[in-house]
């Protein structure tokens, strides 16, 4: 913040909720959130790098603590996929589930960075007045992830059932093959297809955005002397401990919904 005199709830929250953006073209219709893009790509590379490093150092003998943890994580995710997806899960779905979980977990975990310290670093070291560290608190990120999974479900549905079989399923389920019922079947299936990426993305976004707001409120109370620095730190630490559950749980739910949608794409009614 530029001045302590300007510090009030409105300016404090607006400052921390403003993305670093660049406009594409002459107009302002297409605006890129460069902080979201940078952090998403960076953490994607980090997640792949971590997995690659563990795999490269894996041994058949007594595993290291890191290798043992990763093996437990892979086994846990594989068991979750196995209960939902009944095809050849190792060809795509299980590796995709592992990638989604690790990536989204790292994206969510950025919420643990102290917002005021990070804001000071971004502004005074990198010259960035506005920069948001939590990509999943930006609906553009969660919708892009959900939309990618949605496209994959359509791709696999057509691949497994054929284009004709997929269209037939759209117009003939759930009420049957009577031509009089085709419009109702199609309407219900279109609504279902549209609602999947919306609910998938907004669930993750809503939880992470709310968590970020609470961290901001706690930081604002401490900065303005409402709770005091010490008591504010205690409140922040308490919420951070509880937020660990939210961060992990939301990554798990997002991954499992992706597996469920991919499983549905491989099944016939």
UniProtKB/Swiss-Prot annotation:
TM segments? 35-55, 92-112, 143-163, 213-233, 240-260
Naming one, the record's GO cellular component terms include: plasma membrane
What biological function has been recorded for the protein in this entry? Key component of the proton channel; it plays a direct role in the translocation of protons across the membrane.
HAMAP family, per the entry: ATP_synth_a_bact
Bilayer topology annotation: Multi-pass membrane protein
The Swiss-Prot or TrEMBL record describes its family as follows: Belongs to the ATPase A chain family.
Which Gene Ontology terms cover its molecular function? proton-transporting ATP synthase activity, rotational mechanism
Q: Where in the cell is it found?
A: Cell inner membrane
Signal peptide coordinates: none
- For this entry, the protein name equals ATP synthase subunit a
Q: How does it assemble?
A: F-type ATPases have 2 components, CF(1) - the catalytic core - and CF(0) - the membrane proton channel. CF(1) has five subunits: alpha(3), beta(3), gamma(1), delta(1), epsilon(1). CF(0) has three main subunits: a(1), b(2) and c(9-12). The alpha and beta chains form an alternating ring which encloses part of the gamma chain. CF(1) is attached to CF(0) by a central stalk formed by the gamma and epsilon chains, while a peripheral stalk is formed by the delta and b chains.
Keyword list (alphabetical) reads: ATP synthesis, Cell inner membrane, Cell membrane, CF(0), Hydrogen ion transport, Ion transport, Membrane, Transmembrane, Transmembrane helix, Transport
Report the main location listed first in the record: membrane
Name any Gene Ontology BP term.
proton motive force-driven plasma membrane ATP synthesis
């Amino acid at each position: 913040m530029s001045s302590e005199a300007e510090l009030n709830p409105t300016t404090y929250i607006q400052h921390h909720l403003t993305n670093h953006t660049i406009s594409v073209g002459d107009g302002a219709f297409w605006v890129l959130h460069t902080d979201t893009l940078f952090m998403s790509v960076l953490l994607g590379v980090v997640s792949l790098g971590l997995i690659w490093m563990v795999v490269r150092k894996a041994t058949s003998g007594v595993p290291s603590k890191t290798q043992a943890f990763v093996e437990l994580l892979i086994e846990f995710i594989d068991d979750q996929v196995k209960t939902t997806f009944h095809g050849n899960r190792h060809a795509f779905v299980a590796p995709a589930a592992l990638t989604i979980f690790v990536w989204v977990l790292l994206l969510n975990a950025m919420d643990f960075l102290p917002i005021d310290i990070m804001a000071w670093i971004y502004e005074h070291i990198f010259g960035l007045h506005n920069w948001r560290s939590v990509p999943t608190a930006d609906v553009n990120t969660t919708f892009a992830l959900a939309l990618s999974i949605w496209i994959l479900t359509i791709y696999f549905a057509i691949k497994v059932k054929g284009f004709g079989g997929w269209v037939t399923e759209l117009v003939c389920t759930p009420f049957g093959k009577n031509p009089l019922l085709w419009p109702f079947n199609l309407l219900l299936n279109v609504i279902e297809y549209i609602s999947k990426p919306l609910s998938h993305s907004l669930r993750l976004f809503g939880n992470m955005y709310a968590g970020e707001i609470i961290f901001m409120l706690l930081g604002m109370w401490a900065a303005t002397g409402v709770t005091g620095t010490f008591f504010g730190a205690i409140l922040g630490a308490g919420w951070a401990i509880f937020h660990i559950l939210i961060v992990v749980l939301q990554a798990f739910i997002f991954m499992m919904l992706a597996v469920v949608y991919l499983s549905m794409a491989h099944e016939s009614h």
